[in-house]
Amino acid sequence: MVNMLVTVNISKGWNTWCQMAKGLEPRMNEVGSKILWAGCTADESAVYVLVEMNDPSFLKSFGEQQEIVAIREAGGADVSSTTPITEISNYFIS
């Protein structure tokens, strides 16, 4: 498994984005991926997400499917701004 830290600009605030992300969880799980952690900037204009996946290509193969793009956009995500920051090998959540 690979853990990637990703950022995305959002336009409808944290709560709307968070509801959308939680709604996508079952579909992500079907393809062996899940959100481990997510947080937003103080002005709620961007989110940072730690995603567990089988392969980094998941970001494109899943995140850019037309149906998934429509769901993400409805949740306020600027899909074109999706940016992988780095692979994360170790982390803890207290």
What do the predicted segments below correspond to?
Residues 1-94:
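Short S/T/G/P-rich N-terminal loop/turn motif that feeds into the first structured element of a domain
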